[in-house]
Amino acid sequence: QIGIGAIPNAVLQYLTDKKDLGVHSEMFTDGLIDLIEAGIVNNSRKTFHPGKVVASFCIGTRRLYDYVDGNPMFEFRPTDYVSSPLNIAQNSKMVAINTALEVDL
């Protein structure tokens, strides 16, 4: 999962040496397109919705919207489905990349 903001998107550039990554995230952004086109993200090892990018919504440029429109790799679901701990737990080796705006200890 990739969160909103500069830090999560900056992390994407450091994933270029990885392979067979999958995406299960509320939000899909432009930064992930390059990883898909490079074959880094192919969703082949996902244990929940294998072969599919699962997301609730997109935020980005015209390139992003054109890319996902009609693309069979994408499966858009309601946010409560994508964010359900029961569904997330079905993905083996799930990693979330987010930032915190505020932490109250």
Give a label for each model feature.
Residues 1-105:
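Conserved alpha/beta enzyme-core scaffold
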